[in-house]
Amino acid sequence: MMDDSLRVSILSEALPYIQRFSGRKIVVKYGGSIMEDEKLKEAFFRDIALLSSVGVCPVVIHGGGPEINRWLNKLEISPKFENGLRVTDEKTMEIVEMVLMGRVNKQIVRGINKTGSLAVGISGLDGNLIQSRELGDGSHGLVGEVTQINPELLDPLIAKGYIPVISSIGSTADGISHNINADFVAGEVAAAINAEKLILLTDTPGILKEGDNPNSLVKQINLKDARKFIEKNIVSNGMLPKTECCIRALAQGVKAAHIIDGRIEHSLLLEIFTNSGIGTMINA
């Protein structure tokens, strides 16, 4: 049981951060194991609600890979991946849209709203929020990359205190839908709305200097050194695209990007409101 003096100490430590980030926008990518664990999900919803209640303006971006796989299997469609990307034909894209927009998005909205905060679920199709094009040579089918974010839809929602919850689907000018990596969507949205922070919830502690050794966690790094980590292959495999999207967001004006372990309960608050943080912060 936490004693009163410890509670006061925690609140005292959080106060300057609450004052600093009140009125600022923070984009959070929600994904990984946290989406599969009821206790972690509930903690995340409360964390987002708390951020909103102290004046921070959170925006949530989500994917939903495991749920997509479940529905593909139910419909006897085998999920296919190449180089870590889902091969998305037209039939698969229909399932992706159904699951992300109609199921996962609304589950998140419902969870946040139950806390007393007001979330609004939208996709990248709404108001042409996320414009996209086919990724690379098209070998992955309807997998896309962001070409433009139109923040006009988000600005009035944020100004009125709503919490936008955005599924990572974009479309071309011709209305062709694309399945887009949620990390990169989060980075581009953060840049487009001039966010103070981009935070990626992952299944790792953050950037590690030594393979999978959690004791080698890099707590803080600047943009220049983050690029060097990539050049030296210190950052590789699944951490590579996450670090790249952070770098791109910082290069477009986001003040700081964080890669944190979503498997730790209340990791979002621990990263934002404590002196030591819990993951890796990349500064511009």
Curated annotation (Swiss-Prot):
CDD domains: AAK_NAGK-C. GO terms for cellular component: cytoplasm. Substrate binds at G64, G65, R86, N179. The record marks K29, K242 as: Transition state stabilizer. It catalyses: N-acetyl-L-glutamate + ATP = N-acetyl-L-glutamyl 5-phosphate + ADP. Disulfide bonds: none annotated. Coiled coil: none annotated. It is found in: Cytoplasm. GO terms for molecular function: acetylglutamate kinase activity; ATP binding. Its EC number is 2.7.2.8. Catalyzes the ATP-dependent phosphorylation of N-acetyl-L-glutamate. Belongs to the acetylglutamate kinase family. ArgB subfamily. This is Acetylglutamate kinase.
